Swiss-Prot record:
PROSITE patterns, per database record: HEMOPEXIN_2, ZINC_PROTEASE
Domain comment quoted from the record: The conserved cysteine present in the cysteine-switch motif binds the catalytic zinc ion, thus inhibiting the enzyme. The dissociation of the cysteine from the zinc ion upon the activation-peptide release activates the enzyme.
Enzyme Commission code: 3.4.24.-
EC class name: hydrolase
Superkingdom field: Eukaryota
Family stated for the protein in its record: Belongs to the peptidase M10A family.
GO cellular component, one term: extracellular matrix
Protein's cellular compartments: Secreted, Extracellular space, Extracellular matrix
Cysteine disulfide partners in this protein: C280-C467
Binding site for Zn(2+): C92, H218, H222, H228
Classification of source organism: Eukaryota, Metazoa, Chordata, Craniata, Vertebrata
GO molecular function, one term: metalloendopeptidase activity
Official protein name in the record: Matrix metalloproteinase-18
Length: 467
């Protein structure tokens, strides 16, 4: 509910600015960077009211806490490393919290048929690719609403689109490469609805930064009256996320917000989008779980949680923000401690990862490991370090793979029910940690002692996430 309300707040023109050319300025300290950030996106010292509303709290601290709360960070009021990390991410130039009205539907266009005009083109892409990206970005919104978008060429349009750099006379200068990627203005006359893209960025049509379609779709959300969302998986989240543009689906959070403003589409079957998993949702199901150089990685559709054993909370991020070339909705994953590589499986293919990089020569076919052609996918994979074996689970059977000999062990596959009594056949994920084997089946996890072949305890799957 908070996310939806935030998105329906009225966007306004941005008033504060970073230096137009960062290269001409001496490097800012973290404190200076944070102050500029809070001025620009949280109205530090410019919101027209008392900045210290809470007794005994300095304005900077209050705004910093506001920013930390918005991004779901631990609210410390101090410039801790996680807060600095978020502030340094590339993002949209529109306010997160600050000078906007709580008027909801009045922030929308008062018509359903809108026009747009592309004033100029970036040299980073062929003109046709820019036109396609812009058209597709508008289609993201027209697919879920009654809105239509028509391109015009000579007359002034509702939404004017331009590529520009530095100070471009709208009181919101760009800041050079990185930092702010683009900004847009609320619906209205004049500059209202217009979208500006920083020409100092490198624009692409691939998943490499920065994908024009993804940034444009976000900015056009502002052009239609949406504000930023606190939902990390939403298109209208302030920071840029490196996701595959080919498989992009408008998240449900964005659908709910835009339909509140303009109503539903005329499609007989209303489109739905993916939702962001909640850490303590009792219904969360993991696609795969693996260790990674001392950390734990939990995959859920297009997301992953990254958890250090000594950390109290897990960090949620897009899979493709971590590994840009990796597919989403993977089937299985495990870490080979000998090579320190992560093996990730989807369908009949698997990929080896060394840190953030895909190992050369991958993806490969799973049949190169010795699986019969009847196996179409792997349900779960886990490496048992004390045995030097990797177990692969598929349907009701499992295989044992010798990592030293690089071949399947003889006598396999075997029945899961025979060798792992009490464990259901259909396994979603598995991993080995500190001498215990953990099986994830639906919302439950089974802690298993491989020596005694007994279930030690049954817990909720997300207990690893602090729930």
């Amino acid at each position: 509910m908070n996310s939806l309300l935030l998105k329906l707040l009225l966007c306004v023109a941005i008033t504060a600015a970073f230096p137009a050319d960062k290269q001409d300025e001496p490097p800012a300290t973290k404190e200076e960077m944070a102050e500029n950030y809070l001025k620009r996106f949280y109205s530090l010292g410019t919101d027209g009211g008392p900045v210290g509303r809470k007794k005994h709290i300095q304005p900077f601290t209050e705004k910093l806490e506001q920013m930390q709360k918005f991004f779901g960070l631990k609210v410390t009021g101090t410039l801790d490393p996680k807060t600095v990390e978020v502030m340094e991410k590339p993002r949209c130039g529109v306010y997160d919290v600050g000078q906007y009205s709580t008027v909801a539907k009045s922030s929308a266009w008062q018509k359903k048929d809108l026009t747009y005009r592309i004033l100029n083109f970036t040299p980073d892409l062929p003109q046709a690719d820019v036109e396609t990206a812009i058209q597709r970005a508008f289609k993201v919104w027209s697919d879920v609403t009654p809105l239509t978008f028509t391109r015009i060429y000579n007359e002034v349009s509702d939404i004017e689109i331009s590529f520009t750099a530095g100070d471009h006379k709208d009181n919101s200068p760009f800041d050079g490469s990185g930092g702010i990627l683009a900004h847009a203005f609320q619906p209205g006359n004049g500059i209202g609805g217009d979208a500006h893209f920083d020409e100092d960025e490198t624009w692409t049509k691939t998943s490499e930064i920065y994908n024009l379609f993804l940034v444009a779709a976000h900015e056009f959300g502002h052009s239609l009256g949406l504000s930023h969302s606190t939902d990390q998986g939403a298109l209208m989240y302030p920071t840029y996320s490196n996701t595959d543009p080919k498989t992009f689906q408008l998240p449900q959070d964005d659908i709910n917000a835009i339909q509140y403003l303009y109503g539903k589409s005329s499609n007989p079957v209303q489109p739905t989008g993916p939702s962001t998993p909640s850490r303590c949702d009792p219904n969360v199901v993991f696609n795969a779980v693996t260790t990674m150089r001392g950390e734990l990685i939990f995959f859920v559709k297009r997301f992953l949680w990254r958890k250090h054993p000594q950390a109290s909370e897990a960090e949620l991020m897009f899979v493709q923000a971590f590994w840009p070339s990796l597919p989403t909705n993977i089937d299985a994953a495990y870490e080979n401690p000998i090579t320190e590589q992560i093996l990730v499986f989807k369908g009949s293919k698997y990929t080896a990862l060394d840190g953030f990089d895909v190992v050369q020569g991958y993806p490969r076919n799973i049949y190169s490991l010795g699986f019969p052609k009847t196996v179409k996918r792997i349900d779960a994979a886990v490496h048992i370090e004390q045995l030097g074996k990797t177990y692969f689970f598929a349907a009701k059977k499992y295989w044992s793979y010798d990592e030293d000999k690089k071949q399947m062990d003889k006598g396999f596959p075997k029945q899961i029910s025979n060798d792992f009594p009490g464990i259901p056949d259909k396994i979603d994920a598995a991993f080995y940690y500190r001498g215990r084997l953990y099986f994830f089946i639906g919302r439950s996890q089974f802690e298993y002692n491989i020596n005694s072949k007994r279930i030690v305890q049954v817990l909720r799957s997300n207990s690893w996430l602090g729930c």
